[in-house]
């Protein structure tokens, strides 16, 4: 075992000597010269390597520090005396205002009575607050149940986006850096359609509101609109997965990266040519979405613009400029002609196309890092997530400041808000997925125990309101998508 060197031992002895000397010093009323003499004697009694000039300077500094403390101490005493004087004056004035000549005993009784009332009031408030705390702990007995239902494995690279169709039959769509988009049977986990029309990473996938048509955005600087025809296979029994509370956080070792190398999409039908390609961007197209009605589509690009297209003619209708850096996401309102775009410039913008003759824009400035996504809720809210590790809820009628802020421990990626319960699903860089309500109250964390959950960054979440077994999907850079069954008791959602 290594021993201490001579210089280190000497330094420790010197430190111990100083400590013992300093503990033995008592405060006195001696003059400044006496104090300096005492300190000089102390330093001279030690084996000091300091030159005399340096020691004298230190002594002067110590003297100044002590004088400052003395002044503070005297000021404190003077302030206390003034406070006592003011309290006495207030007591006399209060007695004069009351107009009653109270004896000393009566004043004591009155003071004790008021003190008793104050004490009783504090006890009542304390009981009420603690009862609320206890009741909130009791509600955790009805915990959110988050059950892993199905893994969707078949991509050869990380997944950027996940989406669920809005038409029947309900299928799952994934967009991957392996240049493909896959459609899956939610029940069986089997690949139904493979789209290979892009020459770059597929960054997002969204489905037409009424037809079997998909919209994908890609790193090849285009967005493709393509048709699919699916027939669901016969459902098979789901794997028996034990229900795990969403608040558990038991980590597990990473699985072998080769687990996801099996190409489940090799034997599924392939679509190679789109119905139309949208080609007006000069950079990566990072996201795309359908406007309400499905007759127009919007794209977001790293060229700092968002484009609005006519789907039937593929013509560019509007080019939305104003962001100072690359765009990261775009989203459309489910019932109105509104678009929100997110950017690395720490802002997101709301574009209003409800008036055909003019479109307005509002800029939201509330984050300190890249805004990774901003999405609409059913009501008049927008929820934004950022690399600054926060999620903010905004009211479209009052856009100056957020109405709720959620602070987390990791960067937030593409969030999703459920239509029915208005629950926000937060995918994180640290492999976690957390659930919050629209008021910012944490509801659950998806389990990562028993070798379940994501092993790499979670890029996106998507809710499915209509499916009976899986109502939340997540995807990440572990090359898989996961289907979850989330049961949030109504008790947890009470405000």
Swiss-Prot record:
Keyword check for Repeat, yes or no: yes
Q: Where does this protein chiefly localize?
A: cytoplasm
Task: Please provide an example of a Pfam family that matches this protein in its UniProt record.
Answer: WD40
Residues annotated as region Disordered?
1-34, 237-268
Protein's cellular compartments:
Cytoplasm; Nucleus
Read off the InterPro entries from this record: G-protein_beta_WD-40_rep, WD40/YVTN_repeat-like_dom_sf, WD40_repeat_CS, WD40_repeat_dom_sf, WD40_rpt
Per the record's keyword annotation, is Nucleus included, yes or no?
yes
Regions of biased composition (Acidic residues) lie at: 246-264
Q: Cross-referenced SMART domains, in alphabetical order?
A: WD40 (SM00320)
A GO-annotated cellular component: nucleus
Q: Where are the WD repeats?
A: 154-194, 197-236, 280-319, 322-361, 366-404, 407-446, 453-494
Which UniProt key words apply to this protein?
Answer: Cytoplasm, Nucleus, Repeat, WD repeat
Q: Where is the composition biased (Polar residues)?
A: 22-31
PANTHER family recorded: WD REPEAT-CONTAINING PROTEIN 37 (PTHR19855:SF12), WD40 REPEAT PROTEIN 12, 37 (PTHR19855)
Q: What is the protein's name according to its record?
A: WD repeat-containing protein 37
